[in-house]
Amino acid sequence: MSERTLRRPASLAEVAGRPLAGGTDLVPLLQDGLVEADALADVRELLPRGVEGSRIGAGTTLAELERSEEAPGALREACRLAASPQLRHMGTIGGNLLQATRCWYWRLAFPCFLHGGDRCHAREGEHREHAIFANDPCASAHPSDPAAALLACSATILTDRRRLALPELYRLPTDDDRSLTTLEDGELILEIELAPPDDSVYLKAMDRRRFSFPLVGVAAARYGDDVRLGLSGVAPIPWQLDSPEELDRATPLPGTAYKVEIARALVRRALEAVRA
């Protein structure tokens, strides 16, 4: 990582440079040259922190959410399964929602679609951990466990500029815009507001028993007779599943067909759990 300036602004109005909070995702990306920043702005002390009723400060760590009695069960479990204890104590919920893809072609700086190239190398190459929905022109899979839980819990994002429903935070990449979020330059997530469910659960399939990114993650949140589903690891962005039958319309690549069956099983188990 080349030398760069680290600023500690006294207020949000003074933030200039790339925002840095927990740094568990950003710092490795900077070290690997996958993102560029001449200056970093340490915003950790400026972000709201903690859980108050239905509002969560973006600076709240995953470890704090995991222990919070006010957070929905699905979110607590998603935070518990998201990373090692060290990373959970550093990583913030706001940063976790903005995680970069784990796609190895992108991480190895192949000239892939997300890097401005004309094709997705994973589609014709190794893609066992990639997407089963919306996987053309990019087959990357979003790695955030908490994002799936917040999607099921109908979360709303409050930034320093606007308010938007969680699905509006994300976008699928196009030829004109390869980014995966709708945040503008310098825009900061400040708080997350959710609708507390009657019951919720998060289930996850991963290669290792602990501290691995999701092959498939399924969150279910029940509101009366209605159950909302959010999935991780199945699309370039956190994926809202309108019904279990939507899995019939998945478009897996040859190496990801197994994910459809895992998703079916986890959705069935999640629905049974919140309806019990």
Feature roles, as predicted:
Residues M1-A276:
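C-terminal structural segment of proteins
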